[in-house]
């Protein structure tokens, strides 16, 4: 069964969503992060909550640690955190604060030796966020090119004990237009590491189609704020 991970994106301790990762598209969500935690926690089908420090991702250093630590106390659900995590000490601080999983992006992509070290130190608790326009990987809050191909890069990770690869199609993110099923399915076939789909998910039909592609989990952004998404779920 595919897992459901609703997302909370933070700017200035406020729950927001971006479109295509563009910071000037910031949209404040109707629920605060605290309200979102309470809302998502009522659903048995929610396996964990996905929290991103958006300014941390852009600034290359975690900015919302204390606030995220306070959110951790509000739920018994697992929580994963990403955004600006670049050092082992940051990872250890999050784990000490009760965070279950850490997501690394730019640092892990630019330094695979470090990624391997972190994954072996914390097996199954480190997730790699791979964000791409088409097959072109982006870093530093989606603002910089890498000249890395999505599939070539992912194939190099096969011996690293990651919890999973979080794949976001930037062109789909925040648009509620459906995930990139084609590339997501190809990515699942290209690696033995669990693939988590993010970006564009609208409704349960999208979830079912991702499940048919053997996607491990789906991160739900804007759609998770709509009661209609959760109808029929417990």
From Swiss-Prot:
The active site is at 9 (proton acceptor), 131 (proton donor). It catalyses: 1-(5-phospho-beta-D-ribosyl)-5-[(5-phospho-beta-D-ribosylamino)methylideneamino]imidazole-4-carboxamide = 5-[(5-phospho-1-deoxy-D-ribulos-1-ylimino)methylamino]-1-(5-phospho-beta-D-ribosyl)imidazole-4-carboxamide. One of its GO terms (molecular function) is 1-(5-phosphoribosyl)-5-[(5-phosphoribosylamino)methylideneamino]imidazole-4-carboxamide isomerase activity. GO terms for biological process: L-histidine biosynthetic process; L-tryptophan biosynthetic process. The keyword DNA-binding does not apply. Its EC number is 5.3.1.16. It is found in: Cytoplasm. Keywords: Amino-acid biosynthesis, Cytoplasm, Histidine biosynthesis, Isomerase. One of its GO terms (cellular component) is cytoplasm. Its main location: cytoplasm. CDD domains: HisA (cd04732). PANTHER family: 1-(5-PHOSPHORIBOSYL)-5-[(5-PHOSPHORIBOSYLAMINO)METHYLIDENEAMINO] IMIDAZOLE-4-CARBOXAMIDE ISOMERASE. NCBIfam families: 1-(5-phosphoribosyl)-5-[(5-phosphoribosylamino)methylideneamino]imidazole-4-carboxamide isomerase, PRK13587.1. This is 1-(5-phosphoribosyl)-5-[(5-phosphoribosylamino)methylideneamino] imidazole-4-carboxamide isomerase. It comes from Staphylococcus aureus (strain Newman). The lineage of its organism: Bacteria, Bacillati, Bacillota, Bacilli, Bacillales.
